[in-house]
Amino acid sequence: MTLLRGDDFFTSRAVTVAVEPRTPQTAFPEHYHDFWEIVLVEQGAGVHVFNDQPYALCSGSVFFVRDNDRHLFEDVEGLCLTNMLYRSPRGFRFLSDIAAFLPYGPNGEWQGQWQVNAAGMQQLKQSLNSLAELAQSDAPEAIAASESLFLHILVQLRQQCFQTQSSGSERQGVQALLGWLQNNYSEEVNWGSLADRFSLPLRTLHRQLKQHTGMTPQRYLNRLRLLEARRRLQQSDDSITTIAHACGFSDSNHFSTQFRKAFSQAPKSLRHQAFSREE
């Protein structure tokens, strides 16, 4: 597995933050870093496999990555993102500790996937552009300014993340819906009921989901289900039928057909490959 080193990305060893735009982000094999980063998706689609857990990417996706995390990008389609790099939560010169602004849950668990709305992403992009300029200098005043702006961006992210949980505008409702689908893809979904739940007209729901994900709502839902099914086929001993039902497919034959369409491979073939690698 590839180790990405901070010396290849930070302007100098004195600099504590860096900005790396990827426009586009191509498929990239599994890797890890000796630094921490925050990944902000501006547009496009793809799959982010984070510590063996797949996530479907869309505009507004945000991932917090630690130095001991493994991740990769695959199945990318017009994916554009920006990486905000930092040495570590305690690796700053003028900030003492940023742990309070990182995605730790109430019991200390890491909750590294967030979603922000389009307006919030636009504000963040402006701040990232300014940060990219500051991060080019290792003068003490530039480092202090860059760390201050980095903290400001963290605060922006935290505020925008909470905003997506409220009813607010249509865009905020869609972002909250995307988060709900990511965590509840295995449930039986009635789009009309979901539209009511997130205070969205049904036609708006379809239009906005297509705009954010590049897919129809049902295709996006199937994508989430298939990604989880692929993970379970590779990592568990459960039967194909059990996995299909656990991931929201009521018919295992239909699941196999959809799986072959998505991955050009039958579920049985993938499982055989996974078991062969372990032997």
Swiss-Prot record:
HTH araC/xylS-type domain mapped to chain residues: 175-273
CDD domains from the UniProt entry: cupin_RhaR_RhaS-like_N (cd06977)
Record flagged with keyword Repeat: yes
InterPro entries: AraC-bd (IPR003313), AraC_XylS_family_regulators (IPR050204), Homeodomain-like_sf (IPR009057), HTH-like (IPR037923), HTH_AraC (IPR018060), HTH_AraC-typ_CS (IPR018062), RhaR_RhaS-like_N (IPR047220), RmlC-like_jellyroll (IPR014710)
Cellular compartments per GO CC: cytoplasm
Cell membrane is among the record's keywords: no
Matches recorded under Gene3D superfamilies: Homeodomain-like, Jelly Rolls
Annotated compartments: Cytoplasm
GO molecular-function terms, A-Z: DNA-binding transcription factor activity; sequence-specific DNA binding
PANTHER family: HTH-TYPE TRANSCRIPTIONAL ACTIVATOR RHAS, HTH-TYPE TRANSCRIPTIONAL ACTIVATOR RHAS-RELATED
NCBIfam families registered for this protein in UniProt: PRK13503.1
Function (record text): Activates expression of the rhaBAD and rhaT operons.
Subunit structure: Binds DNA as a dimer.
Stated name of the protein: HTH-type transcriptional activator RhaS
Gene (UniProt): rhaS
